[in-house]
A protein has these predicted regions:
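Amphipathic alpha-helical "lid/sensor" segments that cap RecA-like P-loop NTPase cores
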Residues: 2-55
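Short, surface-exposed connector motifs at secondary-structure boundaries
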Residues: 5-6, 77-79, 251-256
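Winged-helix-like regulatory helical subdomains adjacent to P-loop NTPase cores
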Residues: 33-85
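Short hinge/gating elements
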Residues: 53-56, 80-81, 116-117, 153-165
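Short amphipathic alpha-helical interaction segments
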Residues: 88-104
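A short, conserved structural fragment
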Residues: 102-113
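Short, Lys/Arg-rich nucleic-acid/phosphate-binding segment
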Residues: 111-123
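A cross-kingdom feature that marks ATP-driven nucleic-acid transaction machinery
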Residues: 122-289
């Protein structure tokens, strides 16, 4: 739909629409990404300005309560107790609403990969990028949008945060890339399952995560990956931090290789040492090719 956009712009386009063809088709390929976002989201007559709430009204009787829960998740409440605190709803109501949102695939339940039976390691997130982008940025912009200052609001308040917003979405894209290429012989093992690991690093006694974990469940091999959607190249420190985490997933799995996924490439040190350290470097351009 937007063939002339850069890989970065295509990724952002995907990240704010959830990849829904209907929404992407509304992007005018003759306009810049900024103009398209401003026209569709930050404009009183833009199609996306009221789309998420309209969908909730169509789907649920008490749409306002569902909107509150979706908003809480979009803004960082990933566990039931956190959602309860942000919405002031009872636990039973939160569980009921979450179940309905799961059924409609607006949200998804995420487990720490290799620890799916650990009920303490469960997080909720928005599976739909359009809902995520809208609930993260539009409610605070309503006053500006209604007096036709939406584009200025977007350029000053939202555009500088797009890379941060894309962080979680880029991780999902990288996991999808891993699965899509499972049988391409690109990697040193056949990835049959991909996810994210999160929990406590016992050595450092701190919370941490591994952005990408690809498992070859037949050979008990794993690929560990780190993802950065930033304007700076990935460096030695980020690679070393990834390699330090290889003992955190289930001990059945032996690490076959490491992956670094990057919007802005890699430092010379990383490129010079990648082969020796068993690291595969994957710039965003390779993901689109």
């Amino acid at each position: 739909f937007v063939p002339d956009y850069s890989c970065e712009e295509k990724a952002i386009c995907y990240g704010i629409t959830g990849g829904v063809a209907k929404y992407i088709s509304m992007f005018d390929s003759d306009k810049s990404l900024d103009d398209n976002i401003a026209d569709l989201y930050f404009n009183p007559s833009g199609f996306m300005y009221e789309e998420p709430r309209n969908l909730l009204v169509q789907e649920f009787r008490n749409a306002t309560v569902y909107d509150d829960v979706v908003s809480a998740i979009a803004n960082g409440a990933n566990k039931v107790v956190e959602i309860k605190d942000k919405t002031n709803l009872e636990s039973a109501s939160v569980h009921n609403i979450l179940q309905h949102l799961l059924e409609t695939r607006i949200i998804e339940k995420t487990y720490a990969i290799t620890e799916e039976n650990n009920k303490k390691k469960v997080m909720y997130s928005l599976s739909d990028g359009m809902f995520m982008f809208w609930h993260k940025f539009i409610p605070r912009a309503v006053a500006a949008i209604e007096i036709d200052n939406g584009k200025q609001y977007y350029l000053s308040q939202v555009k500088p945060k797009l890379h941060e917003y894309m962080g979680e979405i880029f991780e999902k894209m990288c996991r999808q890339y891993l699965l899509m290429n499972a049988f391409s012989n690109k990697f040193s093992c056949t990835v049959l399952q991909a996810g994210k690991w999160f929990g406590t690093n016992p050595a450092k006694k701190e919370q941490t995560d591994i952005d990408v974990v690809g498992l070859d469940t037949t050979e008990n091999k794993a690929i560990l990956g780190e993802c950065k959607f930033r304007n700076t190249p990935m460096d030695k420190k980020q690679l070393e931090e990834l390699m330090d985490r290889d003992g955190l997933i289930d001990k059945r799995y032996k690490v076959a290789e490491y992956h670094l996924y990057s919007l802005s490439g890699f430092t010379d040190w990383v490129k010079d040492n990648a082969v020796a350290l068993n690291v595969r470097l994957i710039p965003i351009e390779d993901m689109y090719n």
